[in-house]
UniProtKB/Swiss-Prot annotation:
Pfam families: Protamine_P1. Protamines substitute for histones in the chromatin of sperm during the haploid phase of spermatogenesis. They compact sperm DNA into a highly condensed, stable and inactive complex. This is Sperm protamine P1. GO terms for biological process: chromosome condensation; sperm DNA condensation. Disulfide bonds: none annotated. It comes from Alouatta seniculus (Red howler monkey).
Length: 52
């Protein structure tokens, strides 16, 4: 739960979330299977795609 806490909270900035919890990106497949983590994974993947 702690992994997705940062992604879900709006108070924390996106860049901060990336620095704090880089595990969400690595374990995208496993975490994305969960309904609560799907938003976090999608959000991060979208930002990563646009960036690169």
């Amino acid at each position: 739960m702690a992994r997705y806490r940062c992604c879900r909270s709006r108070s924390l900035s996106r860049s901060r979330c990336y620095r704090q919890r880089p595990r969400c990106r690595r374990r995208r497949r496993r975490s994305c299977r969960r309904p609560r983590a799907s938003r976090c994974c999608r959000r991060r993947y979208r930002l990563r795609r646009r960036r690169y």
